[in-house]
Amino acid sequence: MAEDSVTILIVEDDDAYPSFGSLPASHAQYGFRLLRSIFLIMLVIWTAVWLKLLRDALL
């Protein structure tokens, strides 16, 4: 019955960000932070613009 057994391998990794090619994971981490920051800034800007347009339309 050994061929029916299942082995589960758990790998503990402190750095949850993947590495791309030869770049270390820290570079990927900063890239993700940068993209997330840009996305959040754009989200705030678009929200402010839409609120202004909505306010102007209702007044």
UniProtKB/Swiss-Prot annotation:
Annotated membrane topology: Single-pass membrane protein
Predominant place of localization: host cell
Keywords for the protein's UniProt record, in alphabetical order: Host membrane, Membrane, Transmembrane, Transmembrane helix
One term under GO cellular component: host cell membrane
Cross-referenced InterPro entries: Herpes_UL2 (IPR013269)
Transmembrane segments: 32-54
Compartments, record wording: Host membrane
Origin superkingdom: Viruses
Family in the record: Belongs to the HHV-5 UL2 protein family.
The name this protein goes by in its record: Uncharacterized protein UL2
Protein's organism: Human cytomegalovirus (strain Merlin)
Gene: UL2
